[in-house]
Amino acid sequence: MRKIIGIAAATVVVAGLAGCSSAADESAAPANCTPVLGAADLAEEGTLTIATNATLPPMQYVDADGEVIGMRVDLGKEIAERLCLRPKFVNIEFEAQIPGVQSGRWDMIDTGMFYTPERAETIDLVPYEVQAVSISVPAGNPESISTVDDLAGKTIGVEAPGYEFDTLTALAERFATEGKPALTVQTFKTNADAYQALSAGQIDGTSIVESVTSFYQQDGRFETAVGGINEAPLAMGFAKGSKSAAEVARVLSEMRGDGYLPDLFEQYGVTAYEGDIAVSTGPLDS
């Protein structure tokens, strides 16, 4: 089992569309460090406010003590430290994250968001990681799903909106065109809700990135039936023209060079993005 490192010295905010509540503030910006980002660049002076959807273990999730932990939380904390800022994590569903970063409620989206050219027209993106969509099923694979085409006639759950939902929707449309049995795409507010439905036998499978399906199969209740679907880069997200986007890209490039990022990815079994770590606003060159 991969080692999961919890975060320390970071504020966690649990947020919803109707409001939010804050955990105790136990953190401070690093000493002897001058931030490049000032009050005009941040939602809160001296703080890097980071939106994440903590329902995707081991990438980001809430542990038994109520702490938000995981690879992307570790990464967000390290980014904040290198920017001489205090990290504050806002745990909120993905559908609220892009409007929130656009309106300045938080500075950065760090939730495993897939890079798409359409999304890059809406917010600034910094690619850094690569993932593919997978299908998770109950242990024993009772529906004998082993290929994408085996999803015809099945009901697959997915968090929506998102890249995985778009992938399944496109697949359902292809099946319809080809005259195959319908793929029913059942949407959920969070990935955790989809897994609860899968555990209860309400759906045949659920769709999420490979690192998450691999984690869920560790306790023997689920297994990954299909992987490697629509592999693509993942990115941090920022408001258009945000100074923080350029600074985070700089820090991520620094992490790649000094070994922090490769070591973190190896620990969690994640594939690194091989292109330039830079602010992107349209189709990627690589």
Can you name each region flagged by the protein language model?
Residues 28-111:
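Extracytoplasmic small-molecule ligand-binding "clamshell" domains
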Residues 76-83, 164-187:
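Ligand-binding cleft/hinge of the Venus flytrap
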Residues 54, 130-137, 214, 218-253, ...:
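Periplasmic-binding protein-like
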Residues 15-19:
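C-terminal motif of bacterial Sec signal peptides marking the signal peptidase cleavage site
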Residues 88-99, 143, 183-196, 232:
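Short helix-initiation/N-cap motifs at beta->coil->alpha
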Residues 96, 112-120, 169-171, 199-230:
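A ligand-binding cleft/hinge motif common to bilobed small-molecule-binding domains
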Residues 77, 86-149:
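Acidic, polar ligand-binding/catalytic clefts
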